[in-house]
Amino acid sequence: MSSKRKVELCDSLLTWMQTFQVSGPCSSYEDLTGGVAIAQVLNRIDPSWFNEAWLVRVKKDTTENWRLKVSNLKRILQSVLEYYQDVLGHPVSDDHIPDVALIGEFSNDTELRKMVQLVLGCAISCDKKEEHIQQIMTLGESVQQAVMESIQELLSKAPSDAVTSESFINYDSQSRKYYFLSEDNDEKNEILQRCHDLEQQVSLLMEEKKNMMGENRTLKEQQEQSGMGTPQLFNKKLLLLQSQIEQLQEENYRLESSRDDYRQRCQELDRDVQELQQRNQDLTGLAHESQALRDEMDVLRHSSDRVGKLESLVDSYKKKLEDLGDLRRQVKLLEERNTMYMQRTFQLEEDLHKANASRGQVESLSRQVQELHKKHSTESLRAEKWQFEFQTLKEKFEALQKERERLIAERDSLRETNDELRCSHLQQTCLGQADLLLSGSSPPLENLAAEIVPAELRETVIRLQQENKMLCAQEASYHERLCDLQNFLEESNRSKNRLESESRLQQQQIKGLKAQVEELQKQLREQGNRAEDSSQLKRKLEEHLEMLHDAHSELQKKREYIETLEPKADLNMSRKVDELQQILHQKEEDMRAMEERYKRYVDKARTVIKSLDPKQQNYIPPEIQALKNQLQEKDTRIRHLETDYEKTKVQRDQEEKLIISAWYNMGMALHQKSTDEKTQPPNGAQSFLAQQRLATNARRGQISRSHTLLPRYTDKRQSLS
């Protein structure tokens, strides 16, 4: 049978059990393992056999104790087997007898299904079997089919209904077999009662034999008295009496044989009772002994688990002890450094009083720094504004310069045409005067000269004269505007130079103030750390030592944590370095852009100056020279700052690494020392609790000896910084 089919049969039998609607839990097979629901169902099936007195003996609270479950199931199984034997008249085969120990302890579904099958067999074979069969017919088809299969499986291996001597012997052996499984004395009383009943039957049969013998004597006497009658009647009576005597003798023989059998049976039962009593006593002793052994076994199992855990812990401790050799040497080095750091402690305590007085100065300097930052931001905004205006004016200036060049070219062309016209006009006037002198009549000659000059030329000359006047006026206005623009450009350059010088001075002041603030803060931190009283130092040291003691159980994790801590510090420092480098690159790009703008402005100013005054080509204005000097100073300062930044970066990395290694080396050394003191007791081999006490005392001594390590560490950190 497949496992799936078995599960379906179990579910169907559970559904059939739920139709009785008992008060006990019957929702799952786990609820049936206690036996309460099965006992209530049997009480519903046959209340006369499974009565209330029997039901009371079934323990109900068995959820936490599997032995009570097994006891209930044994009692129920014994009663069911007796019901099959005595009431139904046929015993149960060994294949259908469940193992109650597996049901109670492990909730075995297969054995529990056998138990429910026996209950089903009681239901379909009792006096109320029609009602139970009708109740089964009301269930679903799948449930009915599963119940019928269970019934067929139960009846397929059942013996015949006839009660033979073999079945009685088999039942007797089975009853003795299951009697050993029971721990109750009621079964023994039932067997004794049965023996008593058999003895009463034997006594009744003996009395009946005596009565028959008395009747036989009376019949013989009657025969002797009636011997005087007729021979035929006498013969008939004699035959009748002989037949009765034979029957009585046979009955007597049969009763005597049955009496002997019963006597022998009774003797055997007495011997069995004595043996069973003796065995019961032995089994009770064995049961108590087995219970004690089970308790001891549970204790030993618990202790074995604990021993395994302790062995693993000891192995881990051994591995940790192997890694603690370096820490001892580091603790010695730290103790040597502590003596050197203690000398500096007194000096730093004296400096603390001086630093307290400088806190007000630090606060005022920080406020000045904030004000200077605000001024710097406003000045930078003004510089950007002036720069934008300068750019617009520069574009306008370039446009005006182009327009000026175009006008100059047009002016030159107009000058040439004007010169030509003047020459032609002078030539005509000379010719006219010569003709006038020759002819002596000037008015006609003038009219002739006027007629010789074409009208278009006259119009062109007039127009050119007007344009010349306009261009002269426009040139004068452009010249004035150019002077204004040059003045404005010079003024903007002066303001720009002034703002740059102010910004540079402010930056220098800010850097100086920042350096002073950092120096004062560093002094305050150092002196504040030295000013802590001994109680705070002791408390901090105790906290650190407690942390080290906690790390005693997981040293490997701490080592991994140390390895992961150093990359974190490096990562933070690298992140800070990257940010500073980005800021530096951004400032360098800004400086380059400003330098390029300055160069462009200077080149344009140079071209303008050359175009305005071509004679002064080799002259360099002082503003341009000042800008060049400022750019050179900025380049040198940037290079100095870059070199200082690289030096401080390398120094900071070394300081962080030294601080981390010194701190964790100190912790590991303390831990190594405490573990060595625990693993090497002075008085030889001791118990585990004694070793723990020694370890605690050693740890307390280590705390008192390690109070000086923290000042050493802080002095080392300050010296490195």
UniProtKB/Swiss-Prot annotation:
Residues 181-425, 484-659 form a coiled coil. May function to promote vesicle trafficking and/or fusion. May contribute to the establishment and maintenance of centrosome function. Residues 696-721 are annotated as: Disordered. Keywords: Coiled coil, Cytoplasm, Cytoskeleton, Microtubule, Protein transport, Transport. The keyword Cell division does not apply. PROSITE patterns: CH (PS50021). It is found in: Cytoplasm, Cytoskeleton, Microtubule organizing center, Centrosome; Cytoplasm; Cytoplasm, Cytoskeleton. GO terms for molecular function: dynein light intermediate chain binding; microtubule binding. Interacts with microtubules. This is Protein Hook homolog 2. GO terms for biological process: cytoplasmic microtubule organization; cytoskeleton-dependent intracellular transport; early endosome to late endosome transport; endosome organization; endosome to lysosome transport; lysosome organization; protein transport. Its main location: cytoplasm. Pfam families: HOOK, HOOK_N.
